[in-house]
Amino acid sequence: MQNVKIEKYDNSCEKEIMHIEKPMKIEDGIVLLTEKERTKFIKTCELLVRSSKEYKEFIKYFKTYYDIHSCAYFTNLNTDNLSKVKLEIHHEPFTLFDITNIVLNKHLMNDIPLNYFRIASEVTMLHYKHKVGLIPLSITVHQLYHLGKIFIPIQAVDNLGLIEFVKEYEDYIPEEQKDILVEKIKLSKEIEEQGSQDLSILGKKYTYLEIEGQTFPRLIEK
């Protein structure tokens, strides 16, 4: 096939230049329109924190530094003597959800584009700065707390940086959370003055059922 040879190229035709405005910059943030979306966002950040290598390393350090081997309520439940005992680290007086929500408020109020990893990173760093309160609990005690059955005094918690946290994030703590904190401080002082608190909820309690129409074997007295 013979190649076509162009003897002369004429580019003298009329040119038209079109001016286009600079494209609008689109931030990489997330918009939370409903309370449901906000809650989902916070829980996702929580998951990122708990599953991160940095958080796991911190919890390991926390347990080692404070020589944690037992539940703060049941000291006889010791991981050294009982292999099946599992301790969970509880956040108090602000839960991990509360802390994440407060950090989220900071980003929203300062027009910082929302990003899961950015917020999770800040929450994790607060742990390393010892600005969150932590306490070791057995699984049962931890569950009872979240059911509202027991109260954890602030003085029982590792809260060295709590005051610093409140001062730094005061503008971002919801008013209802501030009210709860004030009430917790009040109750903690009362417990400290009394020297103890009612832990009867943690004692054994047997429930016997009497079902109409059913006959149960009687215990034979010796």
Predicted features and spans:
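BZIP DNA-binding basic region
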Residues: 2
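Short, structured coil/loop segments at alpha-helix boundaries
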Residues: 51-54, 114, 138, 174
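C-terminal/domain-terminus segments
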Residues: 6-47, 143-222
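Short Fe-S-cluster ligation motifs
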Residues: 102-126, 167-189
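Short Cys/His-rich Zn2+-coordinating modules
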Residues: 47-60, 116-123
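Short Cys/His-centered divalent metal-binding micro-motifs
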Residues: 112-119, 123-157
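Extended, compositionally biased low-complexity polar/Lys-Gly-rich tracts
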Residues: 87-92, 132-141, 191, 198-200
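Short cysteine-rich loop/turn motifs with clustered Cys
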Residues: 55-110, 138-140
